C-alpha cells in the first residue's frame, strides 16, 4: 500500500513538472535539469554560470527585448557569462513593467547593493561610488551616464539604457572606459555588460538577464574570477528583483 502511494505521488509530481515545463518559453525545458525547473516553478531565482553565448538557454525570435539582451552579450563575445531567470504569475503583477522602469532608472540604488563573498566571509558595498553625469529622456526610453567604482576595481564611466513598451521592459548597462585592477587593465572599454528584460509568456512574467565580461582567462585563477563575477551578478540581480512588489 505504501509503495503504491509513493509511486502515485512520484507519477503525479512527474506529470506536474512536465506540464509546467511545457508552459515555459521554448528551450528552457530543453536545456535545464529538473532541479532548475523545480526551482523556477517554486519562485526561486535561477542563476547559471554558462561562460559563453553558445550556452544561452533561450532562443532568439520570441520577443524583441530578449533578442536585445542576447545581442548585448553577443556583441562583446563574452567569455565570462552568467544567465539569470526568475518567474512570477502575471495575475496580480500587472504593474511589473512600470515597477521595473522606476527601480532601474534610480541609479542611486546602486549604493545600497551589498556584495557578499561567502568564501571569504565578508560583505561590502558593490558600488561604493555612483555619480550621475547626464540623463536623456524620450518616449518610453531613458539613457543615463554615470561615473562608478566597483569594489576591488578602478573607477570607470558607464552608460545605461532603459526601454519599455508592448514587448515588456529592457535594461542595458555597459562600461565606457576601461576597468583596472591595480595597474592591470582587467576589462577594456565596452567589454562589461548587464542586460535584463521582463516579458510575458503563457500567463507568467519572466525576468531574464545576462551578465557578461570579455576579459583574459588566466590559467589557475579562472575559477576564482568566475566565482567572484557570478557572486556580483547574483547580488546585483537579486537586489533588484527584491525591490519589486511581487504577488505569488
Please place each PLM-identified region on the residue numbering.
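Compact beta-sheet-dominated globular domain cores
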Residues: 188-214
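Hydrophobic-ligand binding "helix-grip"
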Residues: 158-195
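Hydrophobic ligand-binding cavity/cleft-lining segments
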Residues: 23-151
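Bacterial N-terminal signal peptides that target proteins for export
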Residues: 1-6
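A short acidic/glycine-rich loop-to-helix N-cap element
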Residues: 182-187, 213-231
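Bacterial Sec-dependent signal peptides at the C-terminal "C-region" and cleavage site
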Residues: 16-23
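Alpha-helical oligomerization segments
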Residues: 221-248
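Bacterial N-terminal signal peptides
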Residues: 8-15
Amino acid at each position: 500500500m505504501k509503495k503504491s502511494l509513493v509511486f502515485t505521488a512520484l507519477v503525479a509530481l512527474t506529470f506536474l513538472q512536465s506540464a509546467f515545463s511545457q508552459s515555459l518559453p521554448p528551450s528552457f525545458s530543453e536545456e535545464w535539469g529538473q532541479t532548475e525547473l523545480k526551482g523556477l516553478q517554486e519562485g526561486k531565482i535561477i542563476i547559471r554560470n554558462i561562460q559563453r553565448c553558445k550556452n544561452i538557454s533561450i532562443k532568439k525570435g520570441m520577443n524583441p527585448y530578449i533578442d536585445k539582451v542576447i545581442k548585448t552579450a553577443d556583441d562583446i563575445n563574452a567569455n565570462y557569462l552568467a544567465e539569470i531567470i526568475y518567474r512570477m504569475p502575471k495575475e496580480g503583477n500587472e504593474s511589473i513593467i512600470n515597477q521595473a522602469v522606476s527601480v532601474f532608472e534610480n541609479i542611486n540604488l546602486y549604493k545600497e547593493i551589498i556584495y557578499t563573498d561567502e568564501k571569504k566571509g565578508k560583505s561590502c558595498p558593490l558600488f561604493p561610488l555612483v555619480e550621475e553625469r547626464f540623463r536623456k529622456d524620450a518616449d518610453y526610453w531613458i539613457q543615463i551616464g554615470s561615473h562608478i567604482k566597483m569594489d576591488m576595481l578602478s573607477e570607470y564611466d558607464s552608460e545605461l539604457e532603459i526601454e519599455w513598451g508592448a514587448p515588456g521592459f529592457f535594461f542595458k548597462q555597459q562600461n565606457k572606459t576601461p576597468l583596472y585592477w591595480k595597474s592591470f587593465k582587467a576589462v577594456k572599454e565596452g567589454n562589461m555588460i548587464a542586460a535584463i528584460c521582463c516579458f510575458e509568456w503563457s500567463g507568467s512574467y519572466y525576468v531574464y538577464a545576462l551578465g557578461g565580461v570579455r576579459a583574459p582567462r588566466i590559467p589557475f585563477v579562472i575559477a576564482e574570477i568566475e566565482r567572484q563575477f557570478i557572486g556580483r551578478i547574483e547580488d546585483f540581480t537579486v537586489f533588484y528583483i527584491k525591490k519589486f512588489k511581487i504577488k505569488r
